[in-house]
């Protein structure tokens, strides 16, 4: 108390206190996750890399799909994830029934994207169409039904602007490698499960959105679409 050393010390601390008050205030934000805002494919690739490393350490003779490698096989031969195309496995939007407007919008969307017009029909492709409508658009898969053959198959869902048209393959197309083995052009599958020996192709027809005859047997007014039009 009152010693000579106390005054210099007091001045020292007061200068330090003033210097601190003159320092500019720095604002700090929240630390961001490096994966936030990036595409989901980045996270999926990280997850695949992690699972791949775990599988290799635990059991080098098993693949990611739990297939046991045979003698002479390598793990890389089964790792073909780069060639796979991503597809949602569950609906990403609320489920809903097909309506007239939704059927027309969905048809024109498929036409603009070029994903259906002129494509050979097959049961597998028809199931993929159902899955796409369910998972991406939330459309319950009770809309994709067709009139009976032979001849042109019309959609039973009013507003869907695609029909199945029989086509004849010329000789060059029949011998082309693209149409061999299990290609839909050679399988001749039919939506009603009865083989009529026809090769069907999806064909866009905008008139299906305005032409509706309730007396024609191939139309079924699903969910009262005409009333809700």
From Swiss-Prot:
Give a Pfam family name: F-protein
Q: Which UniProt keywords apply?
A: Host cell membrane, Host membrane, Host-virus interaction, Lipoprotein, Membrane, Myristate, Viral immunoevasion, Virulence
Tell me which stretches of the chain form a coiled coil.
none
Give the top-rank taxon of the lineage listed in the UniProt record for this protein: Viruses
Q: Is Electron transport included in the keywords of this UniProt record? A: no
Molecular functions (GO terms): GTP binding
The compartments listed are: Host cell membrane
Q: Per UniProt, what is the membrane topology?
A: Lipid-anchor
Q: Give a yes or no for keyword Transmembrane in this entry.
A: no
Annotated region Mediates dimerization: the residues are 127-143
Main location group: host cell
Reproduce the free-text note on domains from the UniProt record: The N-terminal domain is composed of the N-myristoyl glycine and of a cluster of positively charged amino acids. It is required for inner plasma membrane targeting of Nef.
Oligomeric form and interacting partners: Homodimer. Interacts with host CD247/TCRZ; this interaction induces down-regulation of cell surface TCR/CD3 complexes.
Q: Which family does it belong to?
A: Belongs to the lentivirus primate group Nef protein family.
Question: What name does this protein carry?
Answer: Protein Nef
User: Which species is listed as the source?
Assistant: Simian immunodeficiency virus agm.vervet (isolate AGM TYO-1)
**What phylogenetic lineage does the species belong to?**
Viruses, Riboviria, Pararnavirae, Artverviricota, Revtraviricetes
């Amino acid at each position: 108390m009152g010693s000579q050393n106390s005054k210099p010390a007091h001045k020292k601390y007061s200068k330090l206190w003033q210097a601190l008050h003159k320092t500019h205030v720095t604002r700090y934000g929240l630390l961001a996750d490096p994966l936030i805002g990036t595409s989901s494919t980045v996270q999926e690739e990280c997850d695949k890399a992690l699972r791949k490393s775990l599988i290799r350490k635990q059991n080098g003779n098993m693949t990611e799909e739990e297939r046991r490698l045979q003698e002479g096989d390598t793990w890389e031969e089964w790792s073909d994830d780069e060639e796979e195309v991503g597809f949602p496995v569950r609906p990403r939007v609320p489920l809903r029934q097909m309506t007239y407007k939704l059927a027309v919008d969905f048809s024109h969307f498929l036409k603009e994207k070029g994903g259906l017009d002129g494509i050979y029909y097959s049961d597998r492709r028809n199931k993929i169409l159902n899955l796409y409508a369910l998972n991406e658009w939330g459309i319950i898969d009770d809309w994709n039904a067709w009139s009976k053959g032979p001849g042109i198959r019309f959609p039973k869902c009013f507003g869907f602007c695609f029909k199945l048209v029989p086509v004849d393959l010329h000789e060059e197309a029949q011998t082309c490698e693209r149409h061999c083995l299990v290609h839909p052009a050679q399988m001749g599958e039919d939506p009603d499960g009865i083989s009529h020996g026809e090769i069907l192709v999806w064909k866009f027809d905008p008139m299906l959105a305005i032409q509706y005859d309730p007396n024609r047997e191939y139309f079924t007014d699903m969910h009262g679409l005409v009333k809700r039009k």
